Curated annotation (Swiss-Prot):
Places the protein is found: Secreted
Domain of life, source organism: Eukaryota
Key words of the record: Disulfide bond, Secreted, Signal, Toxin
Predominant place of localization: secreted
Propeptide stretch(es), residue numbers: 21-26
Tissue localization of expression: Expressed by the venom gland.
Family listed: Belongs to the neurotoxin 19 (CSTX) family. 08 (U8-Lctx) subfamily.
InterPro entries (alphabetical): Spider_toxin_CSTX_knottin (IPR019553)
PTM entry text: Contains 4 disulfide bonds.
An annotated Gene Ontology molecular function: toxin activity
Naturally occurring in which organism (per UniProt): Lycosa singoriensis
One term under GO cellular component: extracellular region
Signal peptide: 1-20
Name the record gives this protein: U8-lycotoxin-Ls1m
Amino acid sequence: MKLMIFTGLFLFAIVSLIEAQAENEKPCLPEYKVCTHAPGNCCSDLVCDCYGRYKSGAQIGRNCFCLQKGVIYKREN
């Protein structure tokens, strides 16, 4: 009986460790990819920049993209 409990706990620990490793190895988001729902997933040389969308002074949405750190983007007319 003790052997069955020990084996079950051991298997549970191994499965938990494998899941934690898989989560840490998620690929990062490359430049210009949407990061609205995953702001911490941009690659290390990028930052998740968010911009609000407005219509008639009211915010209608928000977009976030993985962009280069320290770069300022300006709107073209």
